[in-house]
UniProtKB/Swiss-Prot annotation:
GO terms for biological process: killing of cells of another organism; lipid catabolic process. It comes from Sicarius cf. damarensis (strain GJB-2008). This is Dermonecrotic toxin SdSicTox-betaIIB2i. Belongs to the arthropod phospholipase D family. Class II subfamily. The keyword Secreted applies.
Length: 274
C-alpha cells in the first residue's frame, strides 16, 4: 500500500493518484464538541508541504465516493484505501465518543449512503492516542444502532502515536477489537527515526495468533534510503509525500520480485503469507 500523505484538498486527490498512490490519508479536524468539520492538518506539518489546505468533511466524502465507485465518471480503480487521520488530540478526551458517532454517521450519510452507494474503498481509522479508544466504541455502536453493521467489514483501526505496543493491545482488547488492525510507526518527514519499534511491530505481525497488527506501515517517508530500509524490514505499506518515489524504489531489482502494488483484491485485514 502506497499512502499519499495529507491529501486534504479535493484537487490533491487526483494529484496523488497520478503520482502512484493507491491509498490516501487525510486529516479530520473537529470542533470542541467532537463534530467533524473539515479536512485540515494545520501548522506545523511536514517539511516542504503546505499545511493549510482544507475541505468541508462532508464535501470531501461526497467527492471521494465518486472516485471510489466503479462505473462513475470520476472512478479511479487504483484507490482502494482511505486513511482518516483523526485529530482527536485537539479535543477533550471525553468528546472522543461523540466524535466516533459523528464520523460514523457522516460516512453512512455521505460515503456509503446507507446502502445506496457502491463506493468500495476500505476505511482505516487512524487514532493518535490510546486514550481516545472510546471513538472506536462509538463508531461501532453507531453502525450497530443504525442497522449497518455490514460496514464493519470495510473498516479497520490503527494507532499512530508510536505508543507502547502492549498498551495498544490492551486498549483494543478493551473495546473488543481483535481483527482489522493495522499498526503504524513513524515521524514527520522533518526528522530521522530509528527502526526499533517498527521492527518489533513487524515481529508481532509475523507471530502466529497475534491479532493486533495485520498490516504494518511506516510514515512519512520522503528519502529513497528510508523507503529501502523499511522495505527490507518487510513493511506492508509506506506513507509518503512522494508516492512516485516509492513506485520507483519498488521497481528496483532488489524489490521488484518481492513486492507489488496492492489491488482491490488484496484483503487489507489479512496477514500476507507469501
Amino acid at each position: 500500500w502506497i499512502m499519499g500523505h495529507m491529501v486534504n484538498g479535493l484537487e490533491q486527490v487526483s494529484e496523488f493518484l497520478n503520482l502512484g498512490a493507491n491509498a490516501i490519508e487525510f486529516d479530520i479536524d473537529f470542533d470542541q464538541n467532537g463534530v467533524a468539520k473539515i479536512t485540515h492538518h494545520g501548522i506545523p506539518c511536514d517539511c516542504g508541504r503546505l499545511c493549510t489546505k482544507q475541505t468541508v468533511f462532508t464535501e470531501y466524502l461526497d467527492n471521494i465516493r465518486h472516485v471510489t465507485t466503479p462505473g462513475d465518471p470520476k472512478f479511479r480503480e487504483q484507490l482502494i484505501l482511505l486513511a482518516l487521520d483523526l485529530k482527536l488530540q485537539r479535543i477533550p478526551v471525553e468528546k472522543a465518543y461523540a466524535a466516533g458517532v459523528d464520523v460514523a454517521t457522516k460516512l453512512l450519510d455521505h460515503y456509503w449512503q446507507r446502502g445506496k452507494s457502491k463506493a468500495r474503498a476500505y476505511i482505516l481509522l487512524n487514532l493518535p492516542l490510546v486514550q481516545d479508544y472510546e471513538f472506536i466504541r462509538a463508531f461501532k455502536d453507531t453502525l450497530k444502532n443504525e442497522g449497518y453493521e455490514q460496514y464493519n467489514d470495510k473498516v479497520g483501526v490503527n494507532f499512530t502515536g508510536n505508543e507502547d505496543l502492549d498498551e495498544i493491545r490492551k486498549v483494543l482488547k478493551k473495546v473488543g477489537v481483535d481483527k482489522h488492525v493495522w499498526q503504524a510507526d513513524g515521524i514527520t518527514s522533518c526528522f530521522a527515526r530509528g527502526t526499533d519499534r517498527l521492527t518489533e511491530a513487524l515481529k508481532r505481525r509475523d507471530t502466529p495468533g497475534y491479532n493486533y497488527a495485520y498490516k504494518v506501515y511506516a510514515w512519512t517517508l520522503v528519502k529513497y534510503s528510508t523507503m529501502r530500509r523499511s522495505l527490507r524490514l518487510g513493511v506492508d505499506g509506506v506513507m509518503s509525500n512522494f508516492p512516485d518515489r516509492v513506485v520507483e524504489v519498488l521497481k528496483e531489482e532488489e524489490f521488484a520480485d518481492k513486492f507489488r502494488m496492492a489491488t482491490y483484491d488484496d484483503n487489507p485485514w489479512k496477514k500476507f503469507t507469501g
